[in-house]
């Protein structure tokens, strides 16, 4: 019925003995959590009682695994114009993850780095298992395929969530760039805006941080409100400060469910 570690929990109704047997103690994984059934016998007098018992068992499992899941999605520019800011970017991102690990509730993380092409560094990983970003991973170069990065990533996460047994309660997408779109091949502003608008209707929220561009205008073109856009200075101090802003906004948004400013 449930599997894990190449072992099974077996539920058997033996009508001739009118008893429910649970197999020897087994551990299994469900929803990222380990469960254990002990050896034992549970007497049932008829098939109706058996069904009631199974329903109760499934209800307990459902309650145990129905956690509020937060999904954090980072889409980070590593084009050539970020040269010289690698250590600040790496340090800032790692600091955000370290602090977010201390927040309550289950969290999964996706991190996509983009220039002319995209690279997925973390693919919906439980935050406790997210390793620090390294210089090898954040190696700058190339152009800025911002629209492709956002469109491809948002659509991929959307599809994954739709096929998940466990439902994500809050999805927060953080987009960081230091320049204008200049090399996307698949997505246009209209495509991205339509995609973001649909996901906002599904409860997602987006934060756009940019430098050397009209940040509010760029955000609006993609369907992200001005109130969720942040301008930062593209130097060492500015990048560090920007990641402090990201951490603060994420912590607040996780409690509220969105990046929207306080009333």
Ranges and model annotations:
Residues 2, 8, 13, 17, ...:
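Aromatic (phenylalanine/tyrosine) cluster motif
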Residues 4, 30, 41-46, 50, ...:
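Acidic, low-complexity intrinsically disordered regions
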């Amino acid at each position: 019925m449930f599997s894990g570690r190449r072992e099974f929990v077996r539920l058997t109704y033996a009508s001739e003995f009118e008893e429910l047997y649970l197999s020897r103690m087994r551990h299994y994984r469900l929803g990222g959590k380990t469960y254990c059934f002990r050896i034992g016998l549970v007497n049932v007098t008829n098939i109706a009682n058996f069904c009631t018992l199974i329903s109760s068992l499934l209800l307990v499992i459902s309650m145990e695994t129905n956690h509020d899941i937060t999904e954090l999605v980072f889409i980070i520019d590593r084009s050539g114009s970020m040269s010289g800011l690698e250590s600040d970017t790496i340090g800032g991102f790692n600091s955000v993850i370290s602090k977010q690990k201390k927040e309550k509730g289950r969290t999964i993380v996706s991190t996509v780095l983009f220039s002319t092409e995209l690279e997925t560094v973390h693919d919906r990983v439980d935050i406790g298992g997210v390793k620090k970003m390294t210089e090898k991973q954040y190696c700058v170069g190339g152009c800025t395929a911002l629209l492709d990065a956002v469109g491809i990533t948002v659509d991929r996460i959307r599809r994954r969530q739709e096929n998940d047994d466990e439902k994500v309660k809050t999805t927060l997408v953080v987009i960081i760039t230091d320049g204008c779109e200049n090399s996307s091949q698949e997505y246009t502003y209209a495509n991205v805006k339509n995609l973001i608008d649909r996901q906002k209707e599904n409860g997602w929220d987006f934060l756009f941080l940019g430098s050397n561009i009209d940040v509010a205008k760029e955000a609006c073109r993609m369907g992200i409100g001005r109130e969720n856009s942040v301008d930062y200075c593209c130097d060492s101090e500015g990048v560090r400060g920007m990641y402090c802003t990201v951490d603060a906004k994420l912590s607040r948004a996780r409690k509220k469910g969105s990046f929207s400013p306080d009333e």
